[in-house]
Amino acid sequence: MVVNIYDTANELERQMRQTQEFIGLKEAFDDLKADKEATDLFVKFQAKQAAAQQKQMQGQEISEDEIKEIQALAKDVTSKDVIQALMAKEQQVDQMIQQLNQIITGPLQELYKQFGPQEG
């Protein structure tokens, strides 16, 4: 029997869009977009965080000023209820993805387990 795993993946993608977790995240993004101040703050925080991560990946140091700016932005971001709600929904989606990843990688884990530490 030939299995087209990509058809299964595409079906999973369609089903994911119908989950409560994804719908909740989409609604949280809609709520964020309705609050211009929170949206601007969120976008600025994401940009600063991405820039810092990029520097780290390139082996560059992040300055003390950059760290302080990111920390201040993080404090401002977490003070916004709409962003806190979004972050909670992101965590729910992330949990779902982690669980799916465990299921999907189950066959690989079984293969490698045979070479793991032996009890006895």
Swiss-Prot record:
Q: What Gene3D superfamilies would the database entry show?
A: YheA/YmcA-like
Q: Which residues form a coiled coil?
A: none
The family database entries (Pfam families) matched by this protein are listed as:
Com_YlbF
Source taxon at top rank: Bacteria
> What family is this protein classified in?
Belongs to the UPF0342 family.
Protein name, UniProt field: UPF0342 protein LAF_1331
Please report the organism this UniProt entry assigns to the protein. Answer: Limosilactobacillus fermentum (strain NBRC 3956 / LMG 18251)
